[in-house]
Amino acid sequence: MSGSVTSTTTETRLCPSNQGSAKKYRPWNDFRSDTLTVPTDEMRRIMYEASDGDCVYEEDEDTRKLEVYVAKLTGKEAALFVTSGTQGNQLCIRSHLHQPPHSIICDDRAHIYNWEAGAIGLFTQAIVRPISPKNNVYITAEEIENKLILGNDIHFSPTGLICLENTIKGAVVPLDEVARISGLAKAHKIPLHCDGARLWDAAVASNVSIKEYCSYFDSVSLCLSKGLAAPVGSIIVGPRDFIAKAKWFRKAYGGGLRQSGMLAAAGLYSIQHNFPLLKQVHKYAIEVAEYAESLGIELEVPTQSNMVTLANINVAILCDEAKKSGIILMGPRIVFHIQITPDAVEILKNVLRRTVERQAVETHIVAKPGEFCVGY
């Protein structure tokens, strides 16, 4: 298994290939996001039995166990458990950037730019210089180089940080491109951060270990509560002094936790038990993507992991058909996760077929602006 994680006994109820007779969890039919995953029965038991030390005083055993495990998994000196992916990204950004003026380069579809409530401006006072990738999949080293602001011209805000997101819209930023971007950043002594909320998916899809991906970044944020089904939390990794600085900001941002052991224990369980299940999730997504294309539906980006992004689809009809069929969608982005069942996949395929049939004749049906959205 990519990511160098050794799986212990996996719960049958979670394994997609065995779900014909397995327990259905609440989000079995929910394709809105992999954030909808819920703790399993075994994870809840682990949480109940977790340590109850104080995290702020650095006395919680299970929190420390998670941080040591992830630091080793990623090949970094230290790790820090945080409450969310947004907090993890913002702690890393703030810890990298010390004194304005400074600017950040990222993909124009990036979570840090679009989905974090303007936190970069609030907390770091940086401007963002986004790039729209010419290949429509991921930004390249050449595009980043053309966007760099170097030198001492006082008219401009110098580039202080480059941020990549992997996966982005379900597409994998290839390792060779990550390496080229890392080389560019190092050449100009600019730190490189990875929003790795779904780096687990990138590792599985590309058969590249988490450690190898992380080796190219100065800091990485990894989410535990999306596809891995932990209830709460992300974890950031980097050099020891960097994590020490981030710990100050975590406290300042209200992220200091007390009895965090139950959440950390769930996070560690999610890596060891649920990470290996992502391969089957990707198979479902690719199966549906291929079926959609056979119906004449175009994809916004290639389906390489757990997302199918539909382009030429009537979203109003799509969501109406989904509602009538008993599955949950909220837009043209379809997200698969470890608690989606085979039955739900088949229902989804029928929904796509009926949508194509209806939109060919019911051309008067149009979604209102803002009626449907793409979540995260």
UniProtKB/Swiss-Prot annotation:
Tell me the segments the record calls region Disordered: 1-22
Q: Which InterPro entries match?
A: ArAA_b-elim_lyase/Thr_aldolase, Low_specificity_L-TA-like, PyrdxlP-dep_Trfase, PyrdxlP-dep_Trfase_major
For whether the record's keyword set contains Manganese, the answer is: no
Task: Give the record's keywords alphabetically.
Answer: Lyase, Pyridoxal phosphate
- List modified residues, type N6-(pyridoxal phosphate)lysine: 226
E.C. numbers: 4.1.2.48
- GO terms of molecular function: L-allo-threonine aldolase activity
**What pathway is this protein said to act in by its record?**
Amino-acid degradation; L-threonine degradation via aldolase pathway; acetaldehyde and glycine from L-threonine: step 1/1
Cite a GO CC annotation: nucleus
What residue spans carry the Polar residues bias annotation?
1-21
Q: Please give the SUPFAM superfamilies that the UniProt record associates with this protein.
A: PLP-dependent transferases
Q: Which reaction does it catalyse?
A: L-threonine = acetaldehyde + glycine; L-allo-threonine = acetaldehyde + glycine
User: PANTHER family attached here?
Assistant: L-THREONINE ALDOLASE, L-THREONINE ALDOLASE-RELATED
Oligomer and partners: Homotetramer.
Query: According to its UniProt record, which protein family does this protein belong to?
Result: Belongs to the threonine aldolase family.
What protein does this entry describe? Answer: Probable low-specificity L-threonine aldolase
| Natural source organism | Schizosaccharomyces pombe (strain 972 / ATCC 24843)
